[in-house]
């Protein structure tokens, strides 16, 4: 069973998505801030990290930089209400293991579908393939606006 770490300071959002991931047979660790997320990655086997951007103690950006440096094999996704192009660029600039950026609102089924896809592609084609697909999708979104 794949293991996902979901770091989100909003309790309702965190519990909803963690519950949904568990229903789809994922093991889920929950963190309420970036510092806790980094510590979980250090202590536990994790297949994917999902980070909110704005969290207390340590932002998702800072956590992503640390995780990418310490665990370069773990893909990182952002799930945030912040959807400006500069925020997406900042997220992808946190390291080569940042493979996706989803803008809330996202339905639980959309999140699970993207988690499934990221894990499948990263296992078969590697993190860079997932990252390039996500970057192309983001670029297309901003071109259409």
Question: Across the structure, where does each feature detected by a protein language model lie?
Answer:
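Two-component/phosphorelay signaling modules centered on CheY-like receiver
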Residues: 11-29, 96
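Alpha4 helix (beta4-alpha4-beta5 surface) of REC/receiver domains from two-component response regulators
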Residues: 62, 83-102, 109, 113
